[in-house]
Structures are given as C-alpha cells and as structure tokens.
Regions:
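A short, hydrophobic C-terminal helix/tail in secreted or cell-surface proteins
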Residues: 1-11
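Terminal and linker regions of secretory-pathway proteins
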Residues: 18-479
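Intrinsically disordered, low-complexity polyampholyte segments enriched for Lys and acidic residues
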Residues: 5, 14-19
Length: 479
C-alpha cells in the first residue's frame, strides 16, 4: 500500500490467503496434542528444562518453513497467556531473545562467556513462543531465490500461516489468551501479525469458524513511524545525552536536516547537512548505539569472525557474532566491535542443533541474515495499524529503554504525539522493589512505558523489572 490512510486491509486479503486460512481452520479440528517429535528436555551445558519445551518447524509453503521454540509456562500452562516473540533487524534471529533476553537460560550475554539459568524468564507466568522470521533467518528455511526476498506484508502473511501451523501442533492452547511481542524492527512485525490475526478472526466469525483468542501486543523499542524513528530522532537524542555540541543540533534544526533509516528515503535539507551529519556520527562512533551508556565489546580479528562446525560429517561455516557496524547499517561510522561470538558458537554446535531438531541440511546459524537476502522496507511502517487494533478493543503496550540510540525514546514520543490519543492516566513512575524502574503514561488505547537506564534490549538489561512489568500487564494487573 502507498497511502497509509487507505482502508487496504481488504486489498491484501487475497484468495490464496483465504484458502490457506480456511484450510488451517478446518485442520485444527482434527489434530492431536503437542508433537512429541519436537520436544526437547535438555540443552548442552544446562540442567533439564523445568517445563515442557519444543523446537521444530512451522511450514509456510513447500519451500519455506519457520523455526520455532515453545516453552510452556511454569505456572498454569493450561490457562496462562501464550506470548509470541520476534526479534527485529529486519532479518535477525529470535534465538537472540531466547538465549539472552527472556528465555529460561542465558548464553554469552554482554560479553560474558557463561551459561546460567535466567532468574526472571518470561515463561514464569506465560507460555512463550519464539519464531525465527522471515524465512531464511537463523534456522528458518528459505529454499529458493524468491523466498529470500520479502517485505512487511509478505512477512506478516507468512507469520500467520506459521501461527496456524503452530496451533495445528498445539491445539490445546487454542483458548489461552494470545499476545504478540517483539523488539526493534519487530515494531513492524508485531502490529502487522496482530492485524493479520484480526482479519483472520473477522473471517472466522463470518464463516462460523473458531477465532484466535488474541488480546493485544507489546512492542519494545520498536520502529513504528519512519518520520520519527531511528535516524530522524538520533540528533536530538545525542544532543540531549550531551554527546555533541550545541552548534550541530542548532544547524540541523535551522536547516531542516533529516536523515532516514537505511537511507530508504532521500534526506531533507541542503547539501551542507551532510558534513554535520557525518560529524555527529563520528563523535558517537565509539559508543554502543544500542545503549549509549553501556560499554562496547572487545575487538576480534577477521579470522576469528569465521566459525566452523561439523554437522553429520560435513563442515559448515557461520559468522561469529555481529559487529555494531553490521547490526547498525544506517550508522555510517559505527565501530567494528563484535558481540555474541560465544552465542554463535553455542547455537552452531552440532549437539545443540540436534537437541533443537535442526536438520543437517540447514545452513549454519547467523545472528542476522546476509547479503543473499533482501528485505524491501514499506513506507507506511506500522503506525497506521494502531487505530485499527484500538478500535477492535485490543490491549496495546509500547515500552522503551530510555538510553537506546538505535530506536530512541525521543522518536517514540514524537509519533505518540502524532497519534493524538487522549491521556487517561498521567505520567508517573513504576517501581520494582521500591526503586523507580521507569515511567508509564496511559493513553486511551495504549500504555507507554519507559525502562530507566537501559537501552534497546530492555528485557536483557533490566531482567526483573521488565519481566515483572510484562507479567503484570498481560494478566491485567497494575505495576
């Protein structure tokens, strides 16, 4: 769609999708409970999983399948909500969250080459479903060239087909409350999938089929409106963090200088904006853009970046970790410090692959996909979906680690102003064990929550506060 005001939620609901949804709804009536072939009970260097856990594939087409991990709630899996999680990118693996942010175990987080049990996993009071999306990301399968090119709409269409395949495997969770969640570029994925579920339910209601028990979504530090998010909000953010001199921000504001995520739009302002933009990025190039107050990782050599593993007697290669320059392609002068090389080695280990039921023909696991894939950004982003889902009565939450330089809180507050929804409960602190963990402002239709003193990966860097906050919210409790 080219016009975000066009009611195009009918346009994309084509016959192919309708047939797929109808078939899936029918199949759901004739399936067995949780697939034994997908269950795993332990991973290397960990103790046994404390709840039932599964890893396998969700078919989308004959040539595409999305890898998932599902871990049941420790509390009441028969009634607790199911929460879907996506990482962003676009093109980064949700195993990053499973192994470092909100899963049962923590592997190699923050430069520490250790494995330990997460004391605050999200599955304490919810069943968690991590999906590697789009096809080709991580251990998800994309078998031909066409499968390796996608966009926001196609990704969401694939995701709902995969979700139906998941319900096929786990029909006993059909009645549990369902929430969709994610961070970063999943600020696009999450509203889009929720909107697809909304459409699925409209059709189900018209045809007498059972609808999904969707309740709402949660987005963390997510891209939502390209007029404000990522690059457009970076200058004001680094000025407010005292990282650049006043003359730079004054020049930008006086000359209407605006740059956009991955340069997919032409920047505004005169050519004289360019050297000032470069100077801003140079001054911040040595920082951790994902948490402006957090240290960067130690450098490693190019040779150390190439990982090798043996799978079924054959050598597979993979990229060890990601540099900030690779992870932040819009940052012209970002540093080459590499994070998560330990995690890359762990996930690519043959024993780990076997435990997760990864087929031997699947390639090595990379944190984010490479140049053989293409993702075509759509100009609309996802803010247009918010009023639709508000009208449907869904709960919406946006939380933001307030030291993020990649998708800054400043940009989020600007598009929230653009929504122009009335405030129901004024800005106030929320606490964890008597300490301020951030602030919350409740709009008519959306809860906006900041997480104090952490950046882009708030569930990783503020484990207890974010887990407590998310748990309370999905269970309808105050925090």
């Amino acid at each position: 769609p080219q016009n975000p005001k066009t009611p195009f939620y009918h346009i994309y609901y084509n016959n192919k999708m309708l047939k797929a949804l109808t078939l899936a709804a029918c199949v759901l009536l004739n399936v067995q409970a949780a697939p034994a072939e997908d269950e795993f009970t332990i991973l290397p260097n960990m103790t046994a999983m404390s709840t039932k856990s599964y890893s396998g594939y969700l078919p989308v087409t004959d040539s595409k399948a999305l890898h998932y991990i599902f871990v049941e709630s420790k509390n009441q899996p028969t009634t607790d909500p199911v929460v879907i999680w996506f990482n962003g990118g676009p093109g980064c693996s949700s195993l990053l969250a499973f192994f470092q942010e909100n899963g049962p175990w923590v592997v190699g987080a923050d430069g520490n080459n250790t494995i330990y049990e997460n004391p605050y996993p999200w599955n304490n009071n919810a069943s968690m479903l991590w999906i590697e999306s789009p096809a080709g990301v991580g251990y998800s399968i994309a078998n031909n060239t066409a499968d390796r090119s996608t966009n926001d709409m196609v990704q969401s269409q694939d995701a709902i087909v995969a979700l139906q395949a998941w319900y096929n495997k786990f029909p006993e969770f059909w009645d549990n409350p369902l929430f969709v969640s994610g961070e970063s570029y999943a600020g696009i994925y999450v509203p889009y999938l929720t909107w697809q579920i909304y459409q699925y339910n409209m059709k189900a209601n018209m045809t007498g089929q059972k609808s999904m028990n969707i309740k709402g979504f949660m987005v963390g530090n997510g891209a939502t409106n390209w007029d404000f998010d990522v690059s457009p909000s970076f200058p004001e953010t680094i000025w407010n963090f005292n990282l650049i001199p006043k003359k730079y921000i004054d020049f930008f504001n006086a000359n209407n200088c605006t740059y956009y995520f991955n340069d997919f739009r032409n920047h505004t302002g005169p050519a004289s904006c360019d050297p000032v933009w470069d100077a801003m990025q140079n001054l911040t190039s040595a920082l951790n853009w994902y948490d402006l107050y957090r240290t960067t990782e130690a450098p490693i050599t190019a040779e150390e970046r190439i990982g090798k593993t043996m799978v079924a007697g054959q050598e597979k290669t993979y990229k060890r970790g990601m540099s900030q320059k690779e992870y932040t392609p819009w940052a012209k002068f970002a540093n080459d410090r590499v994070a998560n090389d330990f995690l890359s080695d762990y996930v690519n280990n043959e024993t780990v692959r076997e435990a997760l039921h990864i087929p031997s023909y699947a390639p090595g696991w990379d944190m984010c996909w490479g140049s053989q894939f293409s993702y075509n950004l759509q100009n609309e982003a996802s803010m247009w979906i918010y009023p639709i889902l508000k009208g449907a009565g869904y709960k919406l939450m946006f939380y933001s680690g307030d030291t993020d330089g990649a998708v800054p809180t400043y940009g989020t507050k600007r598009w929230l102003q653009e929504l122009n929804w009335p405030v129901k409960k004024a800005w106030r602190p929320w606490l964890t064990q008597g300490q301020v963990s951030g602030y919350i402002e409740q709009y008519d239709g959306l809860d906006f929550v900041t997480v104090k003193g952490v950046g882009h990966m708030a569930p990783q860097w503020a484990r207890q506060p974010v887990t407590d906050m998310i748990t309370a919210w999905i269970h309808g409790q105050d925090f």
